């Protein structure tokens, strides 16, 4: 017998959708960029008030070197779920600033069936869809039949060590039957994606140093650290796009037969649309179609994110750089270990004659992955079929970086991810938006998940 009357819940969601969207707009107007203490405090207070109004026990818990974590709890039952989200807005890829001729980044406006604002998809809209699903179940049925916990962080990043400390201190309160992360959007075929994990990362600065100060370039007897750096960076990757760091691919988990049948066989081959949107003639290595999908999801990479040395800007500046620096990203896949990659990088540089090139680690986190045949992916696919006309598909990992691995040390709960979004949602730009109907569907899906978990 079903524990939750989903027809009544759906009707409540439909009646209250305009109010839900108004609340998302209101929350998106708070410019909660991680470095803005005043705005972050406002976003935190907004959430605490909302959770309190729903009847949750809500706490703001301090964290070292981070904005406070919010932990809210409601419901009772044999089963439990942890929702993981964040209330800060991504600012490190594309700064959230007002730009002439562009939409205000925190407008919160609704136009032509779309709600605009930085954070509307990543991650305020996704968070509120989960909150509104709980509100709808409570309003329609009078109770929440499972233990629901929200953990909302205020400092997202490549390597969030504060989360490691927080989970170590509070893991007993965070453990649940499952955790639902915030990663995944609709694909080109309008199917909701469910990510089974996250890629990992090792992000380093490579530094070559020369003289103790900048000298005029006429001193041609002096070594140029820019050349040293260029030669060192060039040694990391071959013309065939293979990373030359020894053992880099040794731990990469091969694509299994189960992944081929349960995951890759169902993925939309949207690589051609992606190539066209990016304005590219082709992808790295010339891959296309299904081969491109396998490379995207199952193969690690190396990216030069930036190089700096000496003079910049217009005009002639006849200088010899004092220092040269390259920002290097190793994006890792299961089962690579960032510590092992770092050690191999040091060995590679030393054996290549670049002992003087320094390595500064800026951040790292290992990848994470759950089995596609586990109970959680199966349940998410089944519940999505009730709400989404085109259903849902599994992705091996989210192509972004996440900290799911933090919970692995302290809990046994499986973690899968999904979020609001679609192929054209322009995430992390001033045009970031969600579609109104996507929001309605996601609220109903989360409610369906809660019902299925209660009946499990």
Predicted feature locations:
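Acidic/His- and Gly-rich active-site-bordering loop/insert found
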Residues: 2-120, 137-146, 328
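Short acidic loop-to-helix transition motifs that present clustered carboxylates
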Residues: 63-69, 159, 186-188, 398-403
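Hydrophobic beta-strand positions in extracellular immunoglobulin-like domains
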Residues: 74, 208, 330-332
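Structural motif
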Residues: 79-82, 114, 149, 177-179, ...
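A common structural junction motif
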Residues: 88, 236-240, 346-355
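Fold-level recognition of mixed alpha/beta catalytic cores in primary-metabolism enzymes, strongest
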Residues: 115, 120-285, 291-300, 409, ...
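An extended, acidic, His-containing surface patch that forms the Zn2+-binding/catalytic region
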Residues: 188-189, 244-323, 331-344, 352, ...
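Hydrophobic core residues within well-ordered beta-strands of beta-rich domains
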Residues: 202, 324-326
């Amino acid at each position: 017998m079903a524990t939750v009357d989903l027809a009544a819940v759906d009707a409540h969601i439909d009646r209250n959708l305009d109010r839900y969207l108004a609340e998302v707009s209101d929350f998106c107007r708070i410019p909660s960029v991680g470095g803005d203490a005043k705005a972050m405090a406002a976003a935190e207070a907004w959430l605490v008030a909302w959770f309190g109004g729903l009847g949750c026990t809500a706490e703001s818990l301090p964290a070292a070197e981070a904005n406070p974590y919010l932990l809210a709890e409601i419901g009772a039952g044999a089963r439990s779920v942890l929702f993981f989200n964040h209330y800060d807005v991504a600012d490190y890829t594309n700064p959230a600033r007002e730009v002439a001729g562009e939409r205000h980044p925190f407008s919160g406006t609704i136009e032509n069936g779309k709600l605009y604002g930085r954070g509307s998809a990543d991650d305020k809209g996704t968070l509120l869809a989960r909150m509104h699903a709980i509100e709808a179940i409570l309003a329609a049925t009078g109770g929440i039949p499972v233990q629901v916990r929200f953990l909302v962080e205020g400092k997202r990043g490549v390597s969030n060590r504060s989360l490691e400390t927080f989970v170590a201190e509070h893991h007993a309160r965070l453990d649940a039957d499952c955790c639902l992360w915030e990663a995944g959007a609709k694909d080109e075929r309008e199917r909701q994606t469910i990510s089974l994990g996250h890629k990992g990362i090792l992000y380093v600065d490579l530094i070559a140093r020369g003289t103790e100060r900048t000298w005029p370039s006429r001193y041609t007897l002096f070594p140029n650290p820019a050349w040293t750096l260029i030669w060192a960076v060039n040694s990391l990757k071959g013309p065939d796009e293979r990373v030359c760091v020894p053992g880099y691919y040794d731990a990469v988990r091969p694509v299994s037969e189960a992944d081929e049948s349960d995951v890759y066989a169902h993925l939309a081959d949207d690589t051609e649309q992606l190539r066209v949107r990016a304005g590219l003639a082709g992808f790295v290595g010339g891959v296309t179609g299904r081969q491109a999908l396998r490379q995207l999801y199952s193969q690690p990479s190396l990216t030069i994110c930036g190089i700096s040395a000496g003079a910049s800007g217009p005009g002639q500046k006849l200088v010899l750089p004092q220092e040269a620096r390259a920002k290097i990203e190793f994006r890792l896949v299961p089962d690579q270990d960032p510590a092992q990659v770092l050690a191999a990088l040091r060995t590679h540089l030393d054996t290549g004659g670049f002992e003087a090139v320094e390595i500064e680690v800026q951040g790292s986190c290992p990848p994470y992955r759950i089995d596609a045949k586990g109970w959680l992916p199966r349940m998410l696919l089944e519940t999505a079929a009730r709400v989404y006309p085109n259903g849902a598909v599994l992705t091996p990992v989210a192509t972004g970086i996440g900290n799911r691995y933090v919970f692995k040390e302290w809990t046994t709960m499986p973690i899968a991810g999904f979020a609001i979004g679609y192929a054209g949602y322009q995430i992390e730009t001033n045009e970031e938006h969600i579609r109104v109907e996507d929001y309605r569907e996601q609220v109903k899906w989360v409610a369906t998940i809660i019902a299925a978990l209660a009946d499990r």
